[in-house]
Amino acid sequence: MIQEIKQDGEARMQKTLEALESTFSKVRTGRAHPGMLTGVMVSYYGSPTPLNQVASVNVEDSRTLLVQPFDRTMVQAIDKAIREADLGLNPMTADVIRVPMPALTEETRKDMQKLARGEAENSRVSIRNIRRDMMNDIKELAKEKEISEDDERRASDDIQKITDKYIETIDSRLSKKETDLMAV
């Protein structure tokens, strides 16, 4: 029972970490990476389709993404979708689409850093809420005399260690993201 509570809680904490990673991948750092265009939807024969299903997105150099449509007739639609995605990007179109990354100003870097810190704090709060739920489940088992006080204390210590591990991971990922953001 205790093991199930810990496994369930740890799985939920892992999902929180994955959500943070996904959010961080969308925060612009001035360096090109394909994850920046993940949310772009292209009108493909009238229906909205994710960009990665109609084109391959690769890094051409550190400041340029190369978008190669699978169907040459989609070039204009992809160009339009990238412009309308409100990412602050201006694609250059030919047979392929090149998306240069604009240089980030100091103010933009600070805004992005603030956004990253906010997301990290939301993830920390989420981790703590999961810990609270796990602790409540353990206390409920102890109250119903299904586990001993020693088991309760041991499980609480284990849950705290798991929580600390995930909070530390969030902090290290935030630190790495801030370093990326502030690198000129």
UniProtKB/Swiss-Prot annotation:
Protein name, as recorded: Ribosome-recycling factor
GO biological process, one term: cytoplasmic translational termination
Pfam families named in the record: RRF
Annotated localization: Cytoplasm
Keyword set includes Cytoplasm: yes
GO annotation, cellular component aspect: cytosol
Principal location class: cytoplasm
Role: Responsible for the release of ribosomes from messenger RNA at the termination of protein biosynthesis. May increase the efficiency of translation by recycling ribosomes from one round of translation to another.
Similarity section: Belongs to the RRF family.
GO molecular function: ribosomal large subunit binding
Keyword line: Cytoplasm, Protein biosynthesis
Species per Swiss-Prot/TrEMBL record: Psychrobacter cryohalolentis (strain ATCC BAA-1226 / DSM 17306 / VKM B-2378 / K5)
